[in-house]
Amino acid sequence: MNNNLFEGSDDDGEDLQLSTNKDYAKTYNILRKKELLQKYKDRGLDVSESEFDSDSSSSEEDEVDPKFDQDFFKTLSSLKSKDPCIYDKGTKFFSESSGDEDDKDGEAPKKKKKAKPVTLKDYERKVILEHNGKFESSDEEQQEKEHEELQRAQSPSAVEEERRLKAEFRKVMNKEDDSEDEEFGGIFKKRSKTKEQTAAEEADFAKWLAGKQAEIQETDKKQLEPLKQYWSSNKLTQGESFLRDYILNKGYANTDESAIPTYDEIVGEAAPLSEDEQELEKQAEFEHKYNFRFEEPDADFIKRYPRTIEQSLRRTDDKRKEKRKELKERKDQEKQQKMKELELVKEMKRKEIDEKIRKLKAVTGNDELGFRDEELEEDFDPAAHDRRMQELFDDEYYNVDEGEEKPECPSDIDELVLEDWDNYDPRQHANGGGEDYEGHCEDDDFNMDCDYDPSTAKEQLQQELIENTRGRKGRKGRRNRFMEMIQAEKPAFNPEDEKTYSEYIDEYYQMDCEDIIGDQPCRFKYVETTPNDFGLTIEEILLAKNKELNQWASLKKAVQNRPEHVEKKEQRLYKMKAKNEDLKRKIFKSLYGEGSDDEEQPAEEKPEVTPAEATAPAENGQVSTEGLSKSKRKRLKRKAAAAAASAPKVLKEESDSKDPKEADGSTEDVQAESSKKKVDTPSKKGKDDANQETKNSPQSTEKTKNNNALKNNKKEPKNVQNGFQKPQNQANKSAKTKSNQPFKTTESAPAKAEKSNGNNPFNKPQSKSQQRQELPPIHKNQGGNKKGPRNANGTNPFKKSNQKPSAPFPAKKTNNFKAKNKQNNNSGITDDRLKAYGINPRKFHKREKYGKKDN
């Protein structure tokens, strides 16, 4: 055994004791200390309890030493890296004084081991040996005096004193105060680290060794690098990983007894619980788990699970998935192969078209083929096409020198001609200058035989050929078939049988496809639709408002895809509808400058009217329209025109109830009124200024008289029933009085008055069908009866009264509606035209045939 193991002990061999049971020895030492303490207290000695503390350094295990840990890590690193120094006998891995932290400076003297604490037993032994058991302070003072005298007698010289001072000073500089009880220590003292700093450095050092920290400030970093790489490796076994954590976390240290609890552990929530409290905590935790055993943990957390779990212990069965994947890949490959085949076919088709174009260019001698690319993209114009043809194929086209030369014939051209024996003529194919030519010795076919006779040779040759053909029937049959083919009539070239240039282009582009489903290529097809402008021009469509266009033709009807016959029918109906100018003016008000009914018109200034002037029009059955808006005045004008159209009905009834003279007078008045209405019917382009001029003219006075006469005639049947008849001159007088009133009214005022007058029995509201029936475009293009006034239906409202001006007897009451529409029976109005105007054809024909039902 190495003797160095016992070098640090100052005790003799007899003081060494062996302890077999640490707990028993610890208990015995405590009891012994208490016994000795009580003994010395009885003697009157002042001994503190700290002197009787147990010798923790000898009796208990040594404390954790950081220097020892570093030496241990260095040794372990050398072992793991298999450093050659581990095989050297003289290598020391652990220093003798491992507890000292400052054994790094070589200039400092070797530190002494920390002094052993003096116990009471040692102190008694020392007193007995040195002072014979006497505890007196006088002896100490005497000893000090003797020591001073001895030193004074042995005082050194000045040089020795200086040398001694320097040595002591150097000793003091390098000396460290190991004893905390000394009153004075060295001049300089190294600052010791606090407990927190030491713990932080140890934690960083442990993290660095475990591979959790990149850098660390350590002088032995290079020596400990192999251990760090070994412990931070991913291939570390479970046992080695446990050993690493056990060493770095100091699991071997008994920290439960020596640890000082914090403030929170003592008084706070982190305070250790007693056994009863721990038992209660366990019971509460078990009860909570039992009550909520059916609930999932983390109920407040939304769990998300992946569709495909990659890291799963279950054996995955993805055979069907692999088959689907293989099938998809195979389909994609087939699709790509078919697309390549289509590309090849498309390329061949393109080459075919290019070849045809090249031939056309060669034949025509024009690189552009007579047409430019821009002209091929434009719409076909026959006139432009004729002009282009005239420019291309003019006289200059045929006069151009194409630079053609006579082709050189091959050397055997004569032989090729002679092969056609069916049309062979010796006189046409003779060499030289005709029958008299006998040949020359330089000719290729010159016969050197002296017995050769050219005239007889030809005959012999023909005879020989005939005999040969007789012996070979097969050649004769072939020759006959060949002759039949030659003599057969060849078909003439028909351009319609050949494809056009556009058809070739269409075939080329039809080879493209968006996708291939199965074996069938799918292409996007365009649907050809019938163009329909809905009876409107481009200017009307662009300038009209969206609301007006939707009123003319709804957007739903314009965008939907309908059959061709329906589109053609709509096209025909809207062309007929477009001829109705009044309907266009009514719908497209923004185009004709009339504005919309929904637009707000600026309020016009109302003239100040006296009460007398205000009551005058009311008495006359007229209403002023100067304060009304423009749209309302137009509606009143239209109602006045409708009332004028219904006037013949009233006149017909009056003529039946009156005598012939009165009927003649009333007829004349009605004719004047009708002519006035026809001439002065308010047009939709009229303005207020024109109305003012008409009122101030002499014709307006005459018009007012006729209006009053018409009103009197309308009221006359009521008076006749009551037994009296109002004189006509009185009506004219009242009309003249009313016309001279200062308050002016518009032309639509009588119609307004008639509407408000409830006593008028002939003022009946017109139905919607009658208003649509009276639209002028239905009879717009009819000829005949052009002269004279016409009503809204285009018929003469006074034709009935003109045919029968006087009746000796009261005429039988007839149906006004039927009589009014008699001229329309032969008008030839189709049902489609009636539907275009929103009229039910069945009801319309019934009204024409039977008349309107009287209530």
From Swiss-Prot:
Highest taxon of the lineage: Eukaryota
Q: Where is the composition biased (Polar residues)?
A: 720-748, 756-773, 792-805
InterPro entries attached here?
Kri1, Kri1-like_C
Renumbered to this chain, the Low complexity biased-composition regions fall at 609-619, 812-826
Q: For this entry, list what GO says about its biological process.
A: endonucleolytic cleavage in ITS1 to separate SSU-rRNA from 5.8S rRNA and LSU-rRNA from tricistronic rRNA transcript (SSU-rRNA, 5.8S rRNA, LSU-rRNA)
List where Basic residues composition bias occurs.
Answer: 630-640, 842-855
Phosphoserine: modified positions:
95, 97-98, 137-138, 179
Cellular component GO terms, alphabetically?
90S preribosome; nucleolus
Give the compositionally biased regions (Acidic residues): 48-64, 441-452
Q: Which residues are in coiled coils?
A: 307-362
**Residue ranges under compositional bias (Basic and acidic residues)?**
82-91, 160-176, 650-664, 674-692
Keyword terms, alphabetized:
Coiled coil, Phosphoprotein
Q: Which family is annotated?
A: Belongs to the KRI1 family.
- What's this protein's name? Protein KRI1 homolog
